[in-house]
Every structure is written in C-alpha cells, then in structure tokens.
C-alpha cells in the first residue's frame, strides 16, 4: 500500500509568531469530501473539515518552528524545519511526500514539491486545513493577550489596521523583529520618525 503524505505550512507571510506546518496521510478507505486550499474555505468549513481529517486520516501531525527560530534561521529555513518536524511526527511512515510550493524539507523519504498542490493533492489540502485551523486558534489566543493589535481579524498579516496598531503601540513581544517593516518601525521610533506608516 502506497502511503502518500501531504505537507503544507501557514504563517510565512505573517509578521508575528512562528510557522505552523502539518503533515497528513489520508485513508483511501475514508475519502473526505470538500478538501481544497484552506484559503478558499470559510473558517467554519475549515474547522469542520479539520475534525473530519483528524478522525479519518491514517496519521497527521501539526508542528511549529518558533518565533525565535524564525528570527535566527530566517523564514525560509524555519518553514522547512516546521515541515520536517511535521513529517517526522507522523505515527506511521509515508512512502512518498508531497509538499505545497517549490521547496522541500530534508527528509529521507522520496518527496516532490507541487506548486498550488493544496488545490491539487487531497493530502496537501488536508495538511493545509490542519495547519491553518491550528494557527488561527493561536491567533485568537494572542488576541486575548494583545487585543490592541487585532490579531483575531488579520491573523498577524500586515494589513492597514495592523500597521496603524503598530504605529500607535509599537511591536509586541511576538512580532518578528527581523522583518523589515517591524525593524524599520523600531529604528523609526529610535529616531522619532515613522513615516513608513503614514
């Protein structure tokens, strides 16, 4: 039996916290209807599918690379690390790994990167959904801790509202200080110049 593992991440483009990645091996005997790129699904639909995936998948794992690892390694290498952890965290070993995107983590299993794989390969779609639901849950927890930033709405991505909150309050402890917009804000505060947020 060929055990195909799908892998995807979320949080690369955010400017807060770490990277979430998921690996998932679906059970061919229990196909799950409605799997597709998590970004094309409503939050409620993602949550419903995530529960179904957890119930019927042969194996799944959600892993992270921490904020500190993103800062130390850079977002690209932290993403690959989170993916590697997710694959290695599976309770059964896959025969083949399919990763959304163009870069592959270092694993000792045959692997293939597929652009837009989260819309093409059901196991990648499932991984995409699991990672997204896990990260969104963490964003709600961060919102409880730092409500002034609105993490519950923009999920840490640099929207206009997020920029305005950063201008008003400065970065929180979970903002990625190595990211250019955050770094420039910190430099700007030192110089009392924050024109980039005007």
From Swiss-Prot:
Main location: cytoplasm
Binding site for a divalent metal cation: 8-9, 100
Domain RNase H type-2: 2-191
Cofactor(s) listed in the protein's UniProt record: Mn(2+); Mg(2+)
Cofactor note: Manganese or magnesium. Binds 1 divalent metal ion per monomer in the absence of substrate. May bind a second metal ion after substrate binding.
Transmembrane spans: none
The enzyme's E.C. designation: 3.1.26.4
InterPro entries linked to this entry: RNase_HII (IPR022898), RNase_HII/HIII (IPR001352), RNase_HII/HIII_dom (IPR024567), RNaseH-like_sf (IPR012337), RNaseH_sf (IPR036397)
Any Gene Ontology biological process: DNA replication, removal of RNA primer
Catalytic activity reported: Endonucleolytic cleavage to 5'-phosphomonoester
Cellular component per GO, a single term: cytoplasm
Localization (cell): Cytoplasm
Gene Ontology terms for molecular function: manganese ion binding; RNA binding; RNA-DNA hybrid ribonuclease activity
This protein's UniProt keywords: Cytoplasm, Endonuclease, Hydrolase, Manganese, Metal-binding, Nuclease
Function in brief: Endonuclease that specifically degrades the RNA of RNA-DNA hybrids.
UniProt family annotation: Belongs to the RNase HII family.
UniProt xrefs under PANTHER family: RIBONUCLEASE H2 SUBUNIT A (PTHR10954), RIBONUCLEASE HII (PTHR10954:SF18)
Protein name in the entry: Ribonuclease HII
UniProt source species: Desulforamulus reducens (strain ATCC BAA-1160 / DSM 100696 / MI-1)
